[in-house]
């Protein structure tokens, strides 16, 4: 099992969710987040005053999938989230040692 964490633009959330459901991903956690990468935010004007917006709104998706589904899930996220501009986001993949369903103590892939 592997955990996929993707930080994407909020406007791409529905497309990414739909793409993941289409390939058979049954569960995911979605969090609102703020952050910046290389784009470092931007400058805006309000009532004639300039101010800096350093932390931009993002969405973080977390999902755990079977090893054989990792590449398909990653490609689904990339295809659905890509705009081709700075700030499209990042994907992180890491190994999961164990998954446990709290309700009935099921363990391993069956708990997904």
Language model: regions and residue ranges:
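Positively charged, small/polar-rich N-terminal and surface patches that mediate targeting and assembly
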Residues: 1-112
């Amino acid at each position: 099992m592997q955990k996929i964490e993707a930080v994407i633009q909020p406007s791409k959330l529905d497309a990414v969710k739909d793409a993941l459901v289409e390939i058979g991903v049954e569960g995911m956690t979605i969090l609102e987040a703020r952050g910046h990468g290389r784009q470092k935010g931007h400058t805006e004007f309000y009532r004639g005053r300039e101010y800096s917006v350093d932390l931009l709104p993002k969405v973080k998706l977390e999902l755990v999938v079977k090893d054989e589904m990792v590449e398909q899930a990653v490609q689904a996220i990339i295809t659905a989230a890509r705009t081709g501009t700075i700030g499209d986001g990042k994907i992180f993949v890491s190994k999961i040692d164990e998954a446990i369903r709290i309700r009935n103590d099921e363990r391993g892939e069956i708990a997904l």
